[in-house]
């Protein structure tokens, strides 16, 4: 750049900073602009790896959608539990009025410290979200769900009234207001969404999400969560096999998948993931039904191997860190994740 251009640019930058404040424009090489993405673990090792950065990015909007009973709320409660382990503060906007506090506690959520709101209208829910984000003291907000954000006009109207596009306009306006503040306050905002069917679609996917297209655009990460099978112990169903596809990712390559187990009353089975990913990475050996690590057998069948890792959290942590190292993901800090599971086992 010539001296004249450089001088003109410096004057323009000075004028912008004077008018809009320091930090309103900066070079990408500056420390503040080029800092690493801060993340919150999802509680699933496989999903953290699929996201490419080790978890959900802070200061961004995330959408999690899927069919009924696919594990959407369970996944977000696990993220809240992981955030609380780091000392963060979370809020849950329960627009569906269906949060099970006892189940949240079983998943490791520190319920007394969790902020909860059960708003009457969609406008109220989004105003509360806006106020919490602007406070700068909240690290994560979950809105459950977009489909339950009913506009005030719809609640006050008659049952058969047609009000097309009202919810989509509400979401579009709210996200326009929220996005900049979310980035500045480094708050992670998760919207849970439901699936609807488009009528008359002959070709392509007839599924769509509620609330219009604004959330699709403003989301940095979109996760499609599906139940793909049942987990049985003898003849009793004890959980679901779940697949999560990263359909949009602005912080890493998209379209990666993670498959993990969600056990009823326990949440995501981290030990089950460690076994599966350990076998894939050739860190855990599998011969027939037997699993072994470092030449020592850890269990016959996945259930027994899972139980062994639950009883030996040091070995589970060691295997997990080796898996993370082999895949280029940051190692887990000592005491995180497994101590919580150990404490839950002791309570039982």
UniProtKB/Swiss-Prot annotation:
GO terms for molecular function: ATP binding; ATP hydrolysis activity; ATP-dependent DNA damage sensor activity; damaged DNA binding; single-stranded DNA binding. PROSITE patterns: RECA_1, RECA_2, RECA_3. Keywords: ATP-binding, Cytoplasm, DNA damage, DNA recombination, DNA repair, DNA-binding, Nucleotide-binding, SOS response. The keyword Nucleotide-binding applies. Belongs to the RecA family. HAMAP family: RecA. This is Protein RecA. It comes from Burkholderia multivorans (strain ATCC 17616 / 249).
